[in-house]
């Protein structure tokens, strides 16, 4: 196996482990054991635990951005609800690791925070890029710096609501949650 393929395999295993473990629980030792290789080989590919964690988090964020990619849906609110559904599914399937990633990003690690913020920025930017001039504008939501700021706030609220909903749905169905969150963006932006 080529070095690039082996590194890719280890990153994939790391992101799989992140779905059921916290970032702190994914050590070089755990990954080496799961992969059936020596710790030294892992250090060869990642240098140290921090570099490994950064690579795994970057890969997890890339996967999240990829799975929430827009579908070919003309109605911008429906499109947003579908993307939010993919996001919700990702959080459900990777709850432990996702919450760990959010906490690590809000902690003292600048590199993890940067990766997390880049992912969030990509998701918010996509709302405006994908919907284009006939999308959010069709809802009466212009693409302005002020609206982008409010969209950032909506994104943070959406993340908090989804993480809480996974633990306790508070009597709100999945569909209702997605529709309310999608509808909240224009409501917040136009308030």
Residue ranges of each PLM-predicted region?
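Helix-turn-helix
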Residues: 9, 13, 17-51, 55
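Hydrophobic alpha-helical connector segments
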Residues: 55, 69-95, 137, 143-154, ...
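Short, basic, alpha-helical segments at the C-terminal edge of helix-turn-helix-like DNA-binding modules
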Residues: 58-64
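Amphipathic alpha-helical packing segments from all-alpha helical-bundle domains
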Residues: 65, 110-137, 145-156, 160, ...
């Amino acid at each position: 196996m080529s070095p690039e393929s082996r590194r890719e395999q280890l990153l994939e295993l790391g992101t799989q482990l992140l779905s059921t473990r916290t970032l702190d629980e994914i050590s070089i030792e755990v990954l080496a054991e799961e992969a059936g290789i020596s710790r030294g080989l892992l250090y060869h590919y990642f240098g140290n635990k921090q570099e490994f964690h950064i690579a795994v988090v970057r890969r997890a964020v890339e996967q999240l951005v990829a799975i929430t990619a827009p579908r070919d849906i003309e109605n911008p609110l429906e499109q947003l609800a579908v993307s939010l559904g993919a996001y919700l599914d990702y959080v459900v399937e990777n709850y432990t690791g996702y919450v760990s990633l959010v906490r690590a990003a809000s902690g003292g690690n600048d590199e993890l925070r940067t990766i997390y913020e880049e992912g969030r920025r990509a998701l918010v930017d996509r709302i405006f890029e994908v919907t284009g001039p006939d999308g959010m504008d069709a809802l009466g939501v212009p693409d302005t710096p002020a609206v982008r700021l409010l969209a950032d706030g909506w994104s943070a609220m959406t993340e908090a609501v989804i993480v809480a909903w996974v633990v306790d749905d508070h009597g709100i169905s999945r569909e209702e949650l997605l529709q309310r969150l999608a509808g909240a963006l224009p409501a917040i932006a136009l308030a």
